[in-house]
């Protein structure tokens, strides 16, 4: 086994086998793992928010689904991965908070993160 590389919140990284990537504490965040089985290049992003255009402080591309997934893909392609072989797995997107104890009025950042991530993967042609 190679090195275990930690990916923090609003962060992303890539590696090649035998190294591995890990993240913890997803909650409403999304963990997006990309993998090219031929070159064994992997990528992992810990996405916090769905849309970089919704807030002013958006310089950290890894924080957002719309920019983080794109940046992760670019890094993997530079490392030798092929876009047509890359497969994606998504984890996280929990509904974390309810306002005034009313579950129907929950802040739904998790669902928004999931939908934005799926949309970006479709736009990029990643399955």
Give the residues covered by each predicted segment.
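Short loop/turn motifs enriched for small/polar and acidic residues
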Residues: 91-93
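Ubiquitous "structural anchor" signal
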Residues: 16, 35, 51, 100-101
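Phosphate-centric recognition/catalysis
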Residues: 5-22
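Conserved mixed alpha/beta catalytic, RNA-binding, or beta-rich assembly cores of soluble enzyme
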Residues: 22-79
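Alpha/propeptide regions of enzymes that mature by internal proteolysis
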Residues: 1-5, 53, 60-88, 97-127
């Amino acid at each position: 086994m190679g090195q275990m590389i930690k990916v923090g919140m609003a962060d992303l990284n890539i590696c090649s086998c035998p190294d591995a990537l890990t993240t913890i504490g997803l909650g409403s965040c999304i963990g997006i793992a990309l993998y090219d089985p031929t070159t064994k290049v992997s990528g992992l992003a810990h996405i916090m928010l769905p849309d970089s255009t919704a807030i002013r402080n958006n310089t950290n591309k890894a924080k957002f689904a719309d920019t983080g997934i794109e940046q992760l893909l670019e890094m993997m392609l530079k490392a030798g991965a092929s876009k047509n072989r890359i497969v994606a797995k998504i984890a996280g997107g929990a509904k974390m908070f309810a306002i005034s104890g009313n579950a129907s009025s929950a802040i739904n950042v998790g669902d928004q993160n999931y939908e934005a991530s799926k949309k970006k993967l479709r736009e990029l042609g990643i399955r």
